[in-house]
């Protein structure tokens, strides 16, 4: 056991060295990115030893080294939990980050601040590992906030672009809403359990109140971009492609799902929270799949596929299967990072063109990238014996076996079919047919720093699911016999989506352009949610705030009370004074008229 904990500590410690190097010697040399990449590669190799030991021993461990603070009731300490989740996730995250770092050497080669970029990526990874290995809520909150602030810095990396700055602010604001739920849960457990250690929380709060569980659900919805708090996820595509790959594969977006997995024992006996999680995940996975169907930006299609898969993970937690959700996190990381890297390769070679309508015919000019993109898309769709199949098929089988909401199961199956459809659409428009990009475009994919990481992730997308499911034993499995038609449900809807997309492509490639229906606009404009939330509601608020000062300040004070009131007093005084007509002479003359008339009559 000592060897096991020592090896794990040895895995995490070298990651801090590149950051310490920048503190000692701020003038980093050109070799710094290669140094960071080598550190992560060696750390991944070291991490395989404690993971292998965990597979053999199947024994959890907790490392508590340093006490931060002690109050009368609570003791905070630096504590790492080495269990099934953390020991499986660490090598997966390191492997994916290693590939992304090497890809960044090619993609960010001309960036003047590439050293700072690699430092940010490394801190991003470290904060995620802190979150995964934390054994108390406060330490987990440090990692939680760490991935949030690093996502802000990385999304706004190209800070001269207004869209990048807006997307970064949007990401941090939506995550702030989730953080409110997390802090609420922190406060509740401190007051009622007097502890932030998961073991004591589970023992002392076997059936906690609805308040902290709703807080955790809100936190997960914000961080993992569930429906209502989802707009920041496609907007985050304004950052560099390596950032998108790391953000969507093994760091920030899975942090919310991981939070629910880690504290699932608190919620497993609460049917209301389970139902809310299930329905939220089901609606999210369908909505994201519908939006991905009509997107034309290649990175946004992959981003919405991430949102759809996160919804599927929430569905899995909602049917009381956190280990299956974690398995999908691990398998999803490989092909999602690869899809983003293939997209980045295509975008870079086509002079920053992201519109799939202006691509086509890349299968011959970029064979390795195209092959990897096809493998990643098929793995995403859940094609048999690719990495995504081992988790996705199992999730739908388990959903079929469980006593769950049939409505949620139905829309999850529809979303699975749509996943296959938009993956096929992306392949057809990007790789097949005639080239639709300028003829003078210089396409070159011969750089080994581009090809090697894509090759490694392609191998992971082919075999990682088989390796993980056969070597890392699940904690609890329910062996049940189900009919053949239920067993083949996931495969059937996947092939249905594939065939539908192929058929539509064959039927519509020679049709004249018509005005698209309203359903197209709903999908293409993301259900009008950004327009309503980011345009209409702020406009109404601005209009109201504009009218109030105009009516209260300008109209009331500056017009009604002062000028018009003074004018009214002046009119009253004028009326009073104007009753005296100034005709005294005429009045005196009128006295003379009777006298003159009398004299005339007498005479």
From Swiss-Prot:
> What is the catalytic activity of this protein?
a ubiquinone + NADH + 5 H(+)(in) = a ubiquinol + NAD(+) + 4 H(+)(out)
Q: Which Pfam families match?
A: NADH5_C (PF06455), Proton_antipo_M (PF00361), Proton_antipo_N (PF00662)
Instruction: Name the source's superkingdom.
Output: Eukaryota
Identify the enzyme class. translocase
One GO MF term: NADH dehydrogenase (ubiquinone) activity
Look up the record and report any one GO term of the cellular component aspect. Answer: mitochondrial inner membrane
Keywords noted in UniProt: Electron transport, Membrane, Mitochondrion, Mitochondrion inner membrane, NAD, Respiratory chain, Translocase, Transmembrane, Transmembrane helix, Transport, Ubiquinone
InterPro entries, per the entry: NADH_DH_su5_C, NADHpl_OxRdtase_5_subgr, ND/Mrp_TM, NU5C-like, Proton_antipo_N
> Which EC number(s) are documented for this chain?
7.1.1.2
Q: Where can this protein be found?
A: Mitochondrion inner membrane
Tell me where the transmembrane regions lie: 4-24, 38-58, 87-107, 122-142, 144-160, 171-191, 211-233, 241-261, 272-292, 301-320, 325-347, 370-390, 407-429, 457-477, 482-502, 583-603
Q: How does it sit in the membrane?
A: Multi-pass membrane protein
GO biological process terms, alphabetically, are: electron transport coupled proton transport; mitochondrial electron transport, NADH to ubiquinone; mitochondrial respiratory chain complex I assembly
Q: Which family does it belong to?
A: Belongs to the complex I subunit 5 family.
Under NCBIfam families, the record lists: NDH_I_L
How is the subunit organization of this protein annotated in UniProt? Core subunit of respiratory chain NADH dehydrogenase (Complex I) which is composed of 45 different subunits.
Q: What does this chain do?
A: Core subunit of the mitochondrial membrane respiratory chain NADH dehydrogenase (Complex I) which catalyzes electron transfer from NADH through the respiratory chain, using ubiquinone as an electron acceptor. Essential for the catalytic activity and assembly of complex I.
Tell me the protein's name: NADH-ubiquinone oxidoreductase chain 5
- The species is Pan paniscus
Gene it is expressed from: MT-ND5
